[in-house]
Amino acid sequence: MLRLFRFTLFMIILLMIMLPQTGFARGGSGYAVLDGETGRILIGSNSDARLPIASLTKIWTALVAIENSDLQDEVVISSKAAMSEGSSIYLQAGETVTVETLLYGLMLRSGNDAATALAEHVGGSVEGFVKLMNERAVIAGLTNTVFMNPSGLHHEEHLSSARDTAEMLRIALQNKTFEKIASTVLYRADTVNGMLWENKHRLLREGSGMAADIDDETEQPVSSLKSATGTAFAGKTGFTKVAGRTLA
């Protein structure tokens, strides 16, 4: 019974949506729901349209990093990583952080600095890592996907589709390390600032009962590390002005 319930959840979270402000799956938007075991598309609209996916990119960034590094590898944060544009986990140039911590910062807080640091460590450079991402996408059969960076910041050629993005998550969740990280709601970082990170994915927080556990003064989560157990157990959110809001 538990296995059936988990499989049902698996299918639900394999929904990827790009919603404009005024409608559902119109114009530059699309969605897809896949069978969690076979990858067969169950329902969708504009599911093969090539669109910007924002930080859903980080699903693939995380998987490629996990497959090509050790979680306990130590990464010295470069100035380039620390100064990355967009969302951040506030890494400081020169500090040393494990790959594992960077992965949690990537998936829970969508840190672009974490994405850059992982890319430099695993690929030797951001460009080298992006090459690995695209090679892995070809192996996975993601025919509508091209990556230009590891964070999902807007680039005209950085595109995927709802079907491909759902497939990214389906494939990534077959990796136990990824599943553990992507389903974590709270994580205490071993960075210089030592913050307690809460997953930005609202469905995960609400499912675990953690949505309201925030200190009003510090705006920081007050509970210990916890994994999602509700209607969604893993996923990723994203946003750019061009892509709009994205969800997996």
Regions found by a protein language model. Give the residues of each.
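Bacterial N-terminal signal peptides that target proteins for export
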Residues: M1-L9
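Protein maturation boundaries and topogenic segments
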Residues: R3, Q21-T22
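N-terminal start-of-chain detector that recognizes signal peptides
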Residues: F5, S47-A49, V76-S78, T218-S223, ...
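Bacterial N-terminal signal peptides
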Residues: T8-L19
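Extended hydrophobic/Leu-rich segments
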Residues: L9-M11, G94, L225
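Active-site-adjacent loops and short helices of periplasmic peptidoglycan-processing enzymes
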Residues: G23-R163, E167-K176
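Penicillin-recognizing serine hydrolase domain
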Residues: R26-G30, S125-A248
